[in-house]
Structures are given as C-alpha cells and as structure tokens.
C-alpha cells in the first residue's frame, strides 16, 4: 500500500 510492497 504505502512503503513496503502493498
């Protein structure tokens, strides 16, 4: 979603 992957 924001920083990681989602």
From Swiss-Prot:
GO CC list: extracellular region
Single GO BP term: neuropeptide signaling pathway
Cellular compartments annotated: Secreted
The UniProt record lists the keyword Secreted: yes
Keywords attached to this entry: Amidation, Neuropeptide, Secreted
Modified residues (Phenylalanine amide): 6
Family statement drawn from the similarity comment of this UniProt entry: Belongs to the NPY family.
Its biological purpose: May act as a neurotransmitter, neuromodulator or neurohormone.
Protein name as it appears in the record: Peptide tyrosine phenylalanine 1
Source species: Penaeus monodon
């Amino acid at each position: 979603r924001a920083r990681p992957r989602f």
